[in-house]
Swiss-Prot record:
Documented effect of changing residue 301 to A: Slightly decreases phenacetin O-deethylation activity. Increases phenacetin O-deethylation activity 8 fold. Increases phenacetin O-deethylation activity 10 fold. Increases phenacetin O-deethylation activity 12 fold
Gene Ontology molecular functions: arachidonate epoxygenase activity; coumarin 7-hydroxylase activity; enzyme binding; heme binding; iron ion binding; oxidoreductase activity, acting on paired donors, with incorporation or reduction of molecular oxygen, reduced flavin or flavoprotein as one donor, and incorporation of one atom of oxygen
Effect of residue 471 to T: In allele CYP2A6*7
InterPro entries to which the protein is assigned, alphabetical: Cyt_P450, Cyt_P450_CS, Cyt_P450_E_grp-I, Cyt_P450_E_grp-I_CYP2A-like, Cyt_P450_sf, Cytochrome_P450_fam2
Name of this protein: Cytochrome P450 2A6
Impact after mutating residue 128 to Q: In allele CYP2A6*6; loss of activity
Mutagenesis or variant effect for residue 418 to D: In allele CYP2A6*28
Keywords: Endoplasmic reticulum, Heme, Iron, Lipid metabolism, Membrane, Metal-binding, Microsome, Monooxygenase, NADP, Oxidoreductase
Species, as recorded: Homo sapiens (Human)
Residues at which heme binds: 439
Membrane protein topology class: Peripheral membrane protein
Record-annotated membrane-spanning stretches: none
Amino acid sequence: MLASGMLLVALLVCLTVMVLMSVWQQRKSKGKLPPGPTPLPFIGNYLQLNTEQMYNSLMKISERYGPVFTIHLGPRRVVVLCGHDAVREALVDQAEEFSGRGEQATFDWVFKGYGVVFSNGERAKQLRRFSIATLRDFGVGKRGIEERIQEEAGFLIDALRGTGGANIDPTFFLSRTVSNVISSIVFGDRFDYKDKEFLSLLRMMLGIFQFTSTSTGQLYEMFSSVMKHLPGPQQQAFQLLQGLEDFIAKKVEHNQRTLDPNSPRDFIDSFLIRMQEEEKNPNTEFYLKNLVMTTLNLFIGGTETVSTTLRYGFLLLMKHPEVEAKVHEEIDRVIGKNRQPKFEDRAKMPYMEAVIHEIQRFGDVIPMSLARRVKKDTKFRDFFLPKGTEVYPMLGSVLRDPSFFSNPQDFNPQHFLNEKGQFKKSDAFVPFSIGKRNCFGEGLARMELFLFFTTVMQNFRLKSSQSPKDIDVSPKHVGFATIPRNYTMSFLPR
């Protein structure tokens, strides 16, 4: 009896060893994860990271471990990609494998995998296809949306003239303008600039954007499972997100009550009609939760990124008055002072185009991109990334890649001009990301940036309360987003 028991134990031991050897051989044949600092239990590599400067911390680690490395953000294992080559190889050359969406802990509190931006699989595919088609139907990429942007630019010019050249904080002047463009698409109408609810919504969006870029926001990315139950600034961020969700839900309810299926007024109507068409489809992704969350995606994404870029842009132009002077000269020569700028003017304005590109490159609004996730076991270079591995494509490292930009730390529009003064494209210009999950609002954002910058510069000179040499263009926060410092300025009529 004893002998048979020992034989059974021996067989189990042998079987266990064989299984472990088999797993080890498979891992060995597939390869290993990229190198990285050794993590501690639960806290991961927290001790090697500065949450005040997360982007810089990760770039510092890449100096030791190379352009592809593994980091543990608390219990989260993330593979980080640095530089043009690594990011493009992953997001373009292996686009399908890297097209999953990773975690964005603060936003996940409200979105929970719903909506077009933070979803995965068939849901992401269906909602993205629908959103792109519907935005196109409502004029994005066509003359219709250009007229809407021009109209809103006119409201902005009137508001800035109304300041009488006084020193102002431009933050909400710009965010009101940008937000009204996406509002006209998703809600069917613009807000009055004095609308208190509108201003409250803009403050909510700015507050969330800023929180995700602070030290606490980055700490939450690591330890959300614990911090979501604790008091702290994250609870205020949750309240802001909830306030935005409630506002969108209220808008959706209004549209449901007043819907005419034969005459959609806006994005919400179009989604509601699609819901009716698919109500008998058990696998449909067109239901109320995805409508509210997709609308919220568009509202936040269509407001904060462009308005932050404008805010950074005016600061950079005041820092570099020689650039502002050249912009004025080109506008006066190509457009003049009497007619409104058109998007087609862009083709004749290489300097303005270079300036806007350089503002986006230098401003680097989303430096670590939205996290990706590999959809299946993936071989990348000499490494093996198991299915579900999260990936940070460091867009900022591409925008500052010295192989493409001669002085990447400096603001210099020459980065996008050839020796003849003609605009030149760059493969490393990736502020909208690249690949299958790039920003599908890129066309709208490009049109807004050109028309808003050009219209403002046609009508005003920019004046800072500081001399150019004293203007600080380093960011206030760098986390999920890059947040420029608060500043005041005057818009002086030309």
